[in-house]
């Protein structure tokens, strides 16, 4: 009867329960200063499939293989997966607070006393305790943990996208270094020929030794440029090895065979800013961090309100194992607690959590503005790289023609070596500039795809979390 009398009280309190703290609502775009369109007016959305696996637009099987290895074996991604699993376990721990805790115990013993018969005693018992979530503190804790899990998932997605972008960037750096090596070695052969011609003309008495010395200086300068390019190539290959989870060396040996710089797609559409923000994992992570901080205000506030705990126990004891259960005893208890005074510590924790939520909102808005900045910068970089390509293509054509004419005229004795040297330097500068512009276009395209939030949408579910 006593047990039955407790249920109406518990039910009434449960029905009257409410969740402490504010309900979370995602900030409106207007509060985040999100524009309706990009400054260049582009608005057509990029296809989801192209954005999710954007590196495939370069049509480079070697690059595709490197990205696959990085996604599979990169250690930064592995660390992010571990953090996601920790967040999943934290959520499970929070959810467990909804349920009672039950423990059991048992004992047995035998007493010996001289001159008296031995006797034994045995007991079994169980204790249960349940704190009813009257004011939603546990609900808010679960809400916060669920948001933390989503934030950890989007953090993983952000790491994945960043590793893919870095792999592509280092691959292009390696191919650019190989192209610059090819240019340097081609130029070196030409300079060696010029040196031979200059020496012959000096020996023939046609010119002074100044031509030979100028040619020798040009030859040494071109030879000196090669080691720094080789260093750049080695650095890019070593970084690719680490990104793919390997030690530098054999892992990237196949990349030592030169290949052209991959070509960027003709057109990349940016969509509208609001769509980009939904695609950016770092922005979505920041939004979930804000949701978790808001929920924790309720966790802190719930400590200001009364708490209700139900506890009980049941047990049996006997002098023999066979008699256990013959007599069962137990009890059921309810207790209500209310904080009276703690020097303002609990109220201070509420204020601190509100401040944390304000900081999380500022961080979220900063992520939004940073994402918008990334896209705008990438659009400008891509446009500038393509303009440089056009100009360097024209410069290369003109410099190549000029160098051919200068070389033939010098061989015929119609011009001096300084004119030839100037023409050769202009050709080298134009070739290097065109190679840099080609690579810059690919860098800018990769920067734009990354800024638009590409590279994570096809992730497989991990430990119960999957992108929404």
Segments the model singles out, each with a brief description of its role:
Residues 89, 96, 154, 161, ...:
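Regular, well-ordered alpha-helical segments
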Residues 2-72, 146, 230-278, 284, ...:
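Terminal intrinsically disordered/low-complexity segments used for targeting and assembly
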Residues 202-206, 410-414, 451-455:
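A short glycine-centered flexible hinge/capping loop motif at secondary-structure junctions
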Residues 20, 53, 59-62, 66-69, ...:
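Small/polar-residue-enriched beta-strand and adjacent coil segments characteristic
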Residues 138, 154-272, 381, 385, ...:
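Periplasmic alpha-helical coiled-coil/stalk elements that build and connect Gram-negative outer-membrane
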Residues 310, 336, 353, 357-360, ...:
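Hydrophobic, well-ordered secondary-structure elements that form the walls
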Residues 208, 371, 378, 413-416:
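Alpha-helical heptad-repeat coiled-coil segments that mediate oligomerization/polymerization in large
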Residues 77-80, 87, 145, 152, ...:
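Amphipathic alpha-helical coiled-coil segments
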């Amino acid at each position: 009867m006593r047990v039955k009398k407790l249920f109406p009280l518990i039910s009434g309190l449960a029905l009257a329960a409410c969740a402490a703290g504010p309900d979370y609502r995602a900030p409106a775009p207007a509060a985040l200063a999100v524009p309706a369109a990009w400054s260049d007016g582009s608005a057509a959305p990029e296809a989801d499939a192209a954005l999710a696996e954007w590196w495939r637009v370069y049509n480079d099987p070697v690059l595709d293989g490197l990205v696959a290895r990085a996604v599979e074996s990169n250690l930064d991604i592995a660390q992010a997966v571990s953090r996601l699993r920790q967040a999943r376990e934290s959520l499970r721990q929070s959810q467990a607070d909804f349920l009672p805790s039950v423990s059991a115990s048992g004992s047995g013993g035998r007493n010996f006393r001289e001159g008296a018969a031995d006797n034994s005693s045995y007991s079994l018992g169980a204790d249960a305790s349940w704190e009813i979530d009257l004011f939603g503190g546990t609900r808010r804790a679960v809400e916060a943990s669920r948001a933390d899990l989503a934030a950890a998932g989007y953090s993983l997605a952000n790491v994945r996208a960043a590793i893919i972008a870095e792999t592509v960037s280092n691959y292009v750096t390696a191919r650019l270094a190989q192209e610059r090596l090819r240019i340097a070695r081609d130029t070196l052969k030409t300079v060696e020929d010029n040196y031979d011609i200059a020496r012959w003309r000096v020996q023939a008495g046609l010119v002074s030794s100044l031509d030979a010395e100028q040619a020798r200086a040009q030859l040494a300068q071109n030879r000196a440029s090669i080691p720094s390019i080789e260093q750049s190539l080695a650095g890019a290959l070593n970084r690719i090895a680490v990104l793919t989870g390997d030690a530098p060396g054999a892992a990237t040996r196949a990349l030592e065979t030169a290949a052209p710089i991959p070509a960027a797609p003709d057109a990349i559409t940016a969509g509208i800013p609001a769509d980009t923000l939904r695609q950016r994992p770092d922005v979505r992570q920041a939004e979930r961090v804000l949701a978790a901080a808001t929920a924790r205000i309720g966790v802190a506030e719930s400590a200001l309100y009364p708490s209700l705990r139900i506890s009980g126990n049941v047990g049996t004891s006997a002098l023999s194992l066979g008699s256990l259960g013959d007599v069962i005893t137990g009890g059921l208890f309810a207790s209500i607690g209310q904080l009276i005074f703690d020097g303002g510590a609990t109220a201070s924790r509420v204020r601190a959590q509100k401040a944390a939520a304000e900081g999380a909102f500022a961080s979220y808005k900063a992520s939004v503005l940073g994402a918008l900045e990334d896209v705008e910068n990438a659009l400008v970089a891509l446009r500038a790289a393509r303009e440089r390509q056009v100009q360097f293509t024209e410069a290369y054509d003109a410099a190549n023609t000029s160098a051919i004419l200068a070389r033939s005229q010098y061989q015929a004795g119609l011009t001096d070596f300084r004119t030839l040297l100037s023409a050769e330097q202009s050709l080298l500068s134009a070739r290097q500039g065109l190679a840099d512009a080609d690579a810059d276009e690919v860098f800018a395209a990769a920067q734009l795809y990354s800024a638009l939030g590409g590279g994570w949408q096809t992730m497989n579910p991990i430990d119960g979390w999957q992108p929404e």
